[in-house]
Amino acid sequence: MIDFTLTKKQQELKEGLNQLGRYVIRPMSLEMDKKKDVPETFLRNFMKLSHSFRSEDVNEFTDAAATVNKVRDPSKPSQSNRTAAIGAEELAWADAAMLLCIPGPGLGGPPVRATGTPEQKERFLGMFANMEETELKWGAYGLTEPGAGSDVAAIRTSCRKDGDHWILNGRKCYITNGARAIWTVIFATVDPALGRAGHRTFVVEKGTPGFEIGKIEEKLGLRANETAELVLEDCRVPDANLLGGEEAYASRAGGFMTAMKTFDNTRPLVGAMAVGIGRAAYEYARDFVKENYVLSRPIPRYAAIAERLAKIGRRLEAARSLVYRATYLADMSIPNAKEASMAKAAAGQAAIWACIEAIEICGAHGSLQTEHALLEKWFRDIKVYDIFEGTGNIQRIVISKRILTDLKAF
């Protein structure tokens, strides 16, 4: 039986991040969006704060603790994924772009933890475990290409063996923190004709000859977080950076499964972020109604608005429950691909709908761009949550495949 009750540490984390978001992050949110950057001073102070709350759960959320180098014993239940989801929701409630800027291995962390050799985990994750309080380092995850987004098996970035190195050629696009990452997990193929069986995964370090930063994208939302193009031209990567070593690719889909397993961990967190943005819009619309409508008047006059608020709240609560279920399964080391996709798809759609409804409830006020009315910004930020890490259509395909291959799924 799943218990959704928060532990004392989780409740403290939730309340602390909510206060930080309300009084520190929210007031600078629109300015960060306009300048397309999060001040380094804030990020350094945030890292100091995370170090001052040295607990296993908070370290798991910031992804900067020594424990990230260890493979967790599957027989010992954890709450780290759920704790990360709780933190992600609260920080996305404040500003989702800022959340994506928090130093750490980011999306690059899960594949290194899941399939890296002990030496690779020590080397690449250790860079963050030993990070000083005011030190800023990022990792990144390079999967998407101009011609291969949702269709992961269609990647065309090539890799070929050359002595004790690999030569990589290709382009990666829409890479979160790609320009400032100290290393990026890059997916490539030895032969496109092999499909997923030809995939290989590398950790490519910043400064590697042939590894360059392309353009920084101009975006609809999440503008304070950079999204970059990465270019590999005869990029020489040592054998030691082949994730998991040669033996990891003995199966026909080793590299492909690395990508899929990453999504099983990260999609629930994307769902949690979407819930945070949707909740922000919902609460703003709710408070707007309280302040601007005389609700003591006959109910029929305001029933339509009240009903809309009720539907928003209901959908967001349902989405959060799916997120918690997916993270519970991850913490128990139980396969959760179906539940991760359900959580991500439901949360993204619920939050997009919540932002649209909130703007309509607030009328013209909802379309304003002011530091006190962030609905316009949240509306721009939320759309990508139904796109990245697998579009809504892809999530439905994943869900349907799991249901049809396991008729006892429900």
Language-model features and meaning:
Residues 145-155, 161, 166, 173-177, ...:
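Hydrophobic, small-residue-rich alpha-helical packing segments that form membrane-like cores
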Residues 94, 114-143, 161-164:
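FAD-binding glycine-rich core of flavoenzymes that anchor FAD
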